[in-house]
Design a protein with these regions (language model features):
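Binuclear metal-dependent hydrolase catalytic cores
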Residues: 2-212, 223, 297-320
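Cap/insert and terminal regions of metallo-dependent hydrolase folds
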Residues: 3-7, 11, 15, 210, ...
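Short, surface-exposed acidic/glycine-rich loop or hinge patches that mediate macromolecular interfaces
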Residues: 108, 137, 217, 288-289
């Protein structure tokens, strides 16, 4: 008997079994992570999580706009776009954990996940109202969301023998300079004018670090003022072709529509200039209508005018200012 061959066969068999068991364990963890209860997540350092990075249009590769800011067990969301509950689970944050939602504006891409968040939080056992802070119109939005889901949420709770307390949002409408706090997070709003509806940018500070989430493409001067000296700036970045560029590319687009869209978004050069003048250490770009195939396609344009670190956010990315 060739013992060397037998030994090799045994080693291969053991390796194969180990590989199969490892794959099975990974598959089990992957499946169960989608429904098992999550323990509250604690952030040792002040951290921002890009839960969703899509712009207004549908994007099968990106969830709707939402950024989580956390320190310790205190978590605030900036905007609540589509699939926000799933995005929280992917980040290992229970949907019942965020204590507040800060809206940058009431554009639908920022708000359509609020009912999803509230329903998921109540299903997970939360019974304390979630704070919702935003521009004028936030209170009415909150009332509609609660009215939309209350009957179903309460009916299910009663059927399961759970606490049938109805879901609740504690809405607050704020303007320029408003200051709020959520545990270890200090929150400050700046109004962004010149847009089609009221909008805010948010500065969030914790443990001596600071981050600003802009989210809308107008009033760069106000955003620059709020972001002055910040460690990190989250903001949209989009290039809309000029009528001349569109003509050169043989695009059949109404020139007036292009001008209007350009006023709605922040161009690559502009966002870099805002960050440079404000002295921001790191610039994170999200909400791109047409995400680049390679991040370098974007960062190479912005770094012509900005000297700091540049990142293109993808769903699930985490940043520590």
């Amino acid at each position: 008997m060739n013992f060397r061959v037998v030994g090799l066969a045994i080693a291969l068999a053991v390796g194969l079994v180990s590989w199969v068991l490892t794959c099975a364990a990974w598959r089990f963890d992957h499946v169960t992570s989608g429904f098992l209860p999550l323990a509250p997540r604690a952030f040792e350092r002040f951290t921002l999580v890009a839960l969703g990075t899509a712009a207004a249009g549908e994007d099968q590769n990106r969830r709707g706009s939402a950024v989580a800011a956390g320190v310790g067990s205190d978590i605030a969301l900036v905007d609540a776009g589509r699939d926000v509950a799933e995005a929280l689970r992917a980040a290992k944050i229970p949907p019942s954990q965020p204590g507040a939602v800060l809206f940058t504006s009431l554009l639908p891409e920022n708000t359509v996940g609020l009912d999803d968040l509230l329903a998921a939080a109540w299903l997970a056992g939360r019974r304390a109202p979630i704070r919702v802070i935003g521009p004028p119109g936030t209170a009415e939005l909150a009332r509609h969301v609660v009215a939309e889901i209350t009957a179903g949420v309460v009916a299910r709770a009663r059927a399961l023998g759970d606490d049938p307390a109805p879901p609740a949002l504690d809405a607050l409408e704020v303007g320029d300079g408003a200051r709020e706090a959520l545990g270890g997070l200090a929150l400050r709003a700046a109004a962004l004018g010149d847009g089609p509806l009221p909008a805010l940018a948010w500065r969030i500070e914790a443990k001596g670090r600071s981050a600003v989430v802009g989210g809308t493409g107008w009033d760069g001067a106000a955003l620059e003022q709020l972001a002055r000296g910040a460690d990190l700036l989250f903001h949209d970045a989009n290039h809309v072709p000029s009528p001349e560029e569109a003509a050169a590319m043989s695009l059949d687009v109404d020139p007036e529509r292009l001008r209007r869209e350009a006023a709605f978004y922040t161009d690559f050069d502009e966002v870099g200039e805002i960050a440079q003048r404000a002295g921001v250490r790191t610039l994170v770009l999200y909400k791109m209508r047409q995400p680049a195939v390679l991040d370098l396609q974007v960062t190479s344009r912005v770094d012509d005018v900005y000297d700091g670190h540049i990142a293109v956010a993808h769903d699930g990315d985490e940043f520590t200012p």
